[in-house]
Design a protein with these regions (language model features):
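Small-molecule-sensing regulatory modules
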Residues: 44, 49-203
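A conserved helix-loop-strand patch within extracytoplasmic ligand-binding domains
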Residues: 1-53
């Protein structure tokens, strides 16, 4: 969380933001009869929209722990963030990639952000910061806040820039009903776009 004393500073270049399906080593086709290891309602609800007969089983632990459980036979597949696998040099484990339109990511997914005491390292952070990424993540976090989505809530948002134009994808499973929506407009109106998308998802 951010506060005035310890603000967010530099936003990294965004790694691939989507989620992926990972199969056990040596397996090339997902067996729908085996459970899918998935942490979080956002992924669970969206995956079940794509595959209504899928059996979802909760999973905990870091990426390597989850992969060990997968390869031991406890799960038939996992749903993970592609960015995490790439940063661990495990891209070869990816079997299926889901686009942000198919499975809307969590706000800020794929981005590393610094946080430090106010006023410290300000010049360095300016050099490290990527303003367009910062705008996208702040817009995504704005939507999440408007929907009152904490880190465990079934809420997703992904902002994409095309020049000065922004496309904002949103997902909400609040209330148990999955809803998808998108809005488009000028990036200078990013806050208003987040508010418009929140209204669509709350209707």
């Amino acid at each position: 969380e951010e506060n005035a004393a310890i603000p967010l500073g530099a936003y990294s270049i965004r790694e691939t933001p989507g989620d992926v399906l990972v199969l056990p080593k040596g397996v090339f086709h997902w067996n729908p009869a085996q459970p899918i290891g998935c942490a979080g309602l956002r992924r669970t609800m969206q995956f079940q929209e794509l595959y209504s007969d899928a059996v979802i089983k909760p999973i905990r632990g870091n990426v390597l722990t989850r992969l060990e459980k997968l390869d031991s036979g406890a799960y038939g597949a996992l749903i993970l963030a592609e960015a995490g696998l790439k940063r661990l040099n495990l891209s070869d484990r990816i079997s299926v990639r889901f686009s942000p339109e198919q499975m809307v990511p969590a706000a800020g997914q794929g981005v590393i952000v610094t946080q430090s005491r106010a006023g410290e390292y300000s010049e360095l952070l300016k050099q490290l910061n990527h303003p367009d990424v910062a705008l996208c993540v702040k817009t995504e976090r704005r939507l999440s806040a408007l929907l009152e989505g904490d880190c465990s809530a079934p809420v997703g948002c992904h902002a994409r820039l095309h020049g000065n134009h922004m496309t904002l994808y949103g997902f909400s499973g609040l209330g148990g009903v999955p809803k998808h929506a998108l809005v488009q407009g000028e990036k200078t109106n990013a806050a208003a776009l987040a508010e418009a998308l929140a209204r669509q998802l709350q209707d």
